């Protein structure tokens, strides 16, 4: 089987598995883990949009750090939600996750430390505290069947 055919087959298998999953925590975790695997990513975070228009950390995974919080782990995530709007009501365009949620666009940053477009100070603080070095960041909005962004 050719690589493109294998990837297409895998996406179909993932889609079938996701449509069959009834447990929301397992479903969200599977989405994140499959996205990490498809993107060959070391880490990933799933945010859920709240009624207050914030993005709540729902699941965090980082293979190098052995970090697994949220989802089915039972490990609480003690990080405040990301604001989608600033205090003055303007869109929070400096945070990549809120920008993706507000615009509905997928964003791919080659190096978070070289980006002038977005504020990665939270990422850098995490890196300093753990000894990790975040490199590329792929941010993908998650839409429901009505095409509303429900997470990132």
What are these regions (language model features)?
Residues 135-144:
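A short, aliphatic-rich beta-strand micro-motif
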Residues 33-36, 42-49, 53-58, 97-98, ...:
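Short, hydrophobic-rich beta-strand element in sensory/regulatory alpha-beta domains
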Residues 20, 24, 89-92, 130:
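Residue-level signature of the cytosolic catalytic core of signaling kinases
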Residues 17-20, 29-38, 98-99, 103, ...:
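Amphipathic alpha-helical regulatory segments at dimerization interfaces
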Residues 92-98, 105-106, 110-136:
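Signal-transducing coupling segments at domain and membrane junctions
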Residues 1-30, 37-38, 59, 150:
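Signal-transmission linkers at sensory-effector interfaces
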Residues 45-91, 114-115:
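GAF sensory/regulatory domain recognition
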């Amino acid at each position: 089987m050719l690589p493109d055919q294998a990837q297409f087959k895998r996406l179909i298998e993932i889609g079938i598995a996701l449509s069959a999953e009834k447990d929301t925590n397992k479903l969200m975790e599977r989405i994140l883990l499959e996205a990490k695997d498809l993107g060959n990513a070391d880490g990933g975070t799933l945010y859920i949009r709240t009624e207050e228009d914030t993005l709540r950390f729902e699941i965090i995974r980082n293979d190098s750090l052995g970090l697994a919080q949220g989802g089915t782990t039972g490990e609480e995530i003690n990080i405040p939600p990301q604001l989608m709007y600033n205090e003055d009501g303007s869109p929070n365009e400096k945070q990549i996750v809120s920008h993706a949620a507000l615009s509905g666009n997928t964003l791919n940053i080659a190096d978070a430390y070289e980006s002038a477009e977005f504020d990665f100070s939270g990422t850098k603080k995490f890196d300093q505290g753990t000894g990790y070095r975040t490199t590329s960041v792929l941010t993908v909005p998650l839409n429901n069947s009505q095409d509303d962004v429900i997470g990132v």
